[in-house]
C-alpha cells in the first residue's frame, strides 16, 4: 500500500514584549516589536511492501520521498533604556520618543532589523525490516536497515541597524552599526544505519534482548555570504518587503554581487559521524506487572572540517555515551496503576561550539566558542499513580 500527503501553511505572528531586568542597572528596561510572516508547502509520498516467504519470516520495505519549501519575512524594532520608558510615553519604540529619551540620557541602544528567507528541501530513502522467528517461545532475530539522502538549499537576506547611545566613536558621536548580508547555503545529508537484534526467552514471560546498531552520518554545507554593510545608510528604506524579493534590494547595489563576497562570513563545513550502539535489555511480562531494564553503550567517532572566520579546522573526536533505562508498571486493580520510569543520558557539546571562534556579526549578540565545554549527564525520573 501507499500514501501521499500535501500540507500548506500560512503564518502571521505579531509579538510585543516589555522586560524589566532587576539585576542589571544599566539597560534595565527593554522593549521589542516583531512581525513575522511565513508560508510553506510540503509533499510526502510513502509506500509499504510486505513479503512473507514462509510462516516464520516477514520482510517489510518502506520507500519514502518528500519535498518542501518555506518562505519567511520578518521585521522588528527593539530598544533598551535606563529607566521605565512608559513613564514618558505609551509608545517607547517610536522614533520621536526615542529621540526625546536620548536627550534625557535614558537610551542605551536601539535596533531595527528585517530579513527575507527561502528554503527548499528534497529527500528520498527507504527502510528495510527482516524478522525471523526461531521458535514458538519468542526467540527471534531482526535486521533493520535505513538509507536516506537529502538535498537542500536556502537563501537569506538580513539587514540590521544598531544604535549605541552610550558608546561614542572617535568624533564623539553615538556609535552606529549597519549590517547587511545576503547568503546562499546548499546542504547535502547522507544517513545510513543497520541494526541487528536478537531476543532470547529465559523463561515464561521473561526475555533477554541484545542489539547492535551502526550509524553513519554525513553532512556537507557551503555557505556563501555577501556583505554590503558599507553602503550608504537609508539606501533600502523605500523597498517594500515581500517573499523572495531580495533582488529588489540587491539591484540597488553598485557593481556586481560578487564584488561584495565576504570570505570571513562564508562557511564551509563537512561532518562525518560513525556511531556504534550496543544495547542489552531485560523484559519481564507478568499478570499484574511489567518490568523493562537495560543499558545502552554508544562509542562514536566524529570528524569535523570547517573553514570559517578565516580559521581552518580539521579535528577528530572520540567519545562514549551511556544511557541506562528502567521502566516498571504495576496494576493493583482495573482502576489503579503505578508507573515508574527512569532514563539517564549522556550528551556531548556540538563540535562547532568547541571551536575558539568569536562571531561578532551581531554587535548585540556576540558568540564565542568554548573549547572547555564538558559532556553532560541528564537523569529523568517519573513516578505516576492513577486511580479512579
Residue ranges, per PLM feature:
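Primarily recognizes Gram-negative and organellar outer-membrane beta-barrels
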Residues: 1-388
Amino acid at each position: 500500500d501507499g500514501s501521499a500527503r500535501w500540507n500548506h501553511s500560512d503564518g502571521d505572528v505579531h509579538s510585543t514584549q516589555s522586560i524589566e531586568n532587576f539585576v542589571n542597572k544599566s539597560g534595565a528596561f527593554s522593549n521589542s516589536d516583531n512581525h513575522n510572516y511565513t508560508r510553506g508547502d510540503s509533499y510526502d509520498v510513502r509506500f509499504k511492501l510486505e513479503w512473507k516467504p514462509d510462516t516464520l519470516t516477514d520482510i517489510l520495505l518502506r520507500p519514502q520521498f518528500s519535498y518542501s519549501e518555506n518562505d519567511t519575512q520578518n521585521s522588528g524594532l527593539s530598544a533598551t533604556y535606563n529607566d521605565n520608558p512608559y513613564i514618558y510615553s505609551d509608545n517607547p519604540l517610536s522614533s520621536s520618543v526615542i529621540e526625546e529619551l536620548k536627550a534625557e540620557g535614558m537610551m542605551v541602544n536601539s535596533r531595527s532589523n528585517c530579513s527575507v528567507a527561502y528554503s527548499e528541501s528534497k529527500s528520498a530513502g527507504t527502510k528495510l525490516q527482516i524478522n525471523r522467528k526461531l521458535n514458538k517461545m519468542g526467540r527471534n532475530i531482526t535486521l533493520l536497515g535505513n538509507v536516506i539522502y537529502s538535498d537542500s538549499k536556502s537563501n537569506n537576506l538580513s539587514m540590521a541597524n544598531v544604535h549605541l547611545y552610550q558608546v561614542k566613536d572617535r568624533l564623539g558621536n553615538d556609535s552606529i552599526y549597519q549590517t547587511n548580508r545576503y547568503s546562499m547555503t546548499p546542504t547535502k545529508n547522507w544517513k545510513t544505519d543497520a541494526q541487528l537484534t536478537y531476543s532470547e526467552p529465559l523463561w515464561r514471560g521473561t526475555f533477554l534482548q541484545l542489539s547492535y546498531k551502526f550509524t553513519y552520518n554525513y553532512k556537507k554545507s557551503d555557505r556563501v555570504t555577501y556583505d554590503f554593510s558599507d553602503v550608504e545608510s537609508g539606501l533600502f528604506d523605500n523597498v517594500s518587503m515581500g517573499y523572495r524579493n531580495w533582488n529588489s534590494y540587491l539591484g540597488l547595489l553598485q557593481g556586481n554581487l560578487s564584488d561584495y563576497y565576504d570570505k570571513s562570513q562564508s562557511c564551509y563545513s563537512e561532518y562525518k559521524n560513525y556511531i556504534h550502539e550496543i544495547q542489552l535489555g531485560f523484559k519481564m511480562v507478568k499478570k499484574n506487572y511489567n518490568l523493562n531494564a537495560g543499558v545502552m553503550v554508544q562509542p562514536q567517532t566524529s570528524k569535523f572540517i570547517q573553514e570559517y572566520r578565516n580559521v581552518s579546522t580539521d579535528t577528530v573526536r572520540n567519545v562514549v555515551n551511556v544511557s541506562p533505562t528502567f521502566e516498571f508498571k504495576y496494576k493493583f486493580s482495573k482502576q489503579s496503576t503505578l508507573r515508574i520510569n527512569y532514563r539517564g543520558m549522556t550528551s556531548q557539546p556540538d563540535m562547532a561550539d568547541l571551536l575558539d571562534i568569536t562571531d561578532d556579526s551581531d554587535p548585540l549578540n556576540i558568540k564565542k566558542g568554548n573549547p572547555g565545554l564538558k559532556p553532560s549527564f541528564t537523569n529523568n525520573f517519573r513516578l505516576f499513580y492513577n486511580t479512579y
